[in-house]
Regions:
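Glycine-rich phosphate-binding loop signature in dinucleotide/nucleotide-binding domains
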Residues: 1-6, 86-88, 118-120, 162, ...
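Core catalytic region of metal-dependent phosphoesterases/phosphodiesterases
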Residues: 1-73, 77
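Active-site neighborhood of phospho(di)ester-bond hydrolases with catalytic His/Asp-centered motifs
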Residues: 9-14, 35-40, 95, 123-128, ...
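Active-site environment of divalent metal-dependent phosphoester hydrolases
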Residues: 17-19, 41-46, 102, 125-136, ...
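Active-site-proximal segments of metal-dependent phosphoesterases and phosphodiesterases across multiple
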Residues: 53-59, 88-119, 151
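Short acidic-hydrophobic surface loop/beta-edge motif
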Residues: 81-89, 135-137
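Anionic-ligand binding region
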Residues: 108-145
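Acidic, His/Gly-rich catalytic cores of divalent-metal-dependent hydrolytic chemistry
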Residues: 136-205
Length: 205
């Protein structure tokens, strides 16, 4: 990501979840990212939103909550739900979920994005689904960044997005990066849910 170069780096949330070392991930992102948004997992972690406790065997949030320092809890509570950057002719907005449901919205390639958002000059970066894709419209569009840690389409291919804005033109790109899943599974298999291991080994959509 650093090699690609950027004026700013955005993280759309969910540094916690599925794996046991969310605190380390959170600290690294706090140091790296210019914009760090709250995801639904952070919201669950600080009890901002409720979730079925039966899912905690997958999310692994309950075991991490007691380990958080007061300083980290404060930082988690202060994470914004959205980000906006406006340049000549283009308004770029970021959300973990969707513009109409910032924390828990899901946008897929076949999602009917309301016309109010598909306007010239509007561009969006979103996440939550762990599946990268691009939707385009005149002088605008939407990119789902996918996931760095747990892709749901191709498990050994992490993804992030690059947004390039020049004047009133915006280019959206998804970048895939190989994940060393054998090393990851060897390290974490005893600490993560079997469904997470299956996702890492997945080789198709």
């Amino acid at each position: 990501m650093r090699k690609r170069g950027a004026d700013s780096y955005w993280c759309l949330g969910d540094t916690f979840g599925y794996f046991p070392d969310g605190s380390n991930c959170f600290e690294r992102i706090q140091d790296f990212a210019d914009i760090h948004l709250m995801g639904n997992h952070e919201a669950m972690l600080i009890n901002k939103i409720e979730y079925d406790s039966k899912l905690d065997s997958v999310y692994r949030l309950g075991e991490q909550r007691p380990l958080l320092s007061q300083n980290m809890l404060n930082e988690l509570r202060e994470l914004p739900l959205s980000a906006t950057e406006t340049s000549t002719g283009i308004r770029l907005q970021g959300f973990h979920g969707a513009p109409w449901d910032e924390l828990q919205g899901y946008i897929y390639p076949n999602t009917d994005v309301p016309a109010a958002y598909r306007q010239p000059g509007q561009a969006f970066v979103v996440g939550n689904t762990h599946r990268p894709f691009i939707l385009s419209w005149p002088t605008g569009g939407l990119v789902n960044v996918g996931s760095i840690g747990l892709p749901r389409d191709i498990g050994n291919q992490a993804s992030f997005a690059v947004v390039d804005i020049i004047g009133d033109s915006v280019t959206l790109e998804v970048v895939r990066v190989p994940l060393p899943i054998d090393i990851i599974i060897d390290k974490y298999e005893a600490q993560i849910h079997t469904s997470v291991v299956q996702l890492l080994r997945k080789r198709g959509t």
